[in-house]
A protein has these predicted regions:
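Macromolecular interaction modules
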Residues: 1-104
Length: 104
């Protein structure tokens, strides 16, 4: 199992519409990816590790798939449409990482 993490840096003055992300963008991504997206989670940044520190990321999602190949096969054909929707909820450039889920 792999996890695709898409993280949005918590830059001062940035725009991020959490409601749109939760209610429209992620369900659209799931619909386009079909069964290749086993599940996903959405996180809203609250704080950093030190008291009073801001969260490094304002929001993020984690998309769970069987393999890198299954993610790429499902996401690739829809990448343009999915990425075009980003402007509807943020002006931030997402940071993406694909990880192997070791325990979970």
């Amino acid at each position: 199992m792999i996890k695709v993490s898409v993280m949005y840096p918590n830059n001062a003055g940035a725009r991020f519409d959490h409601d749109y992300y939760r209610d429209k963008h992620m369900p659209m991504l799931k619909q386009k990816m079909g069964d290749a997206c086993k599940s996903y989670t959405i996180d809203k940044g609250l704080a950093g590790g030190a008291p009073g520190a801001p969260a490094p990321y304002i929001g993020m999602c984690h998309i769970f798939c069987d393999s890198v190949e299954s993610f790429q096969a499902a996401f690739g054909p829809h990448a343009k449409a999915i990425m075009a929707d980003v402007a509807n909820y943020t002006d931030l450039k997402p940071v993406m990482q694909i990880s192997e889920v070791v325990v979970g």
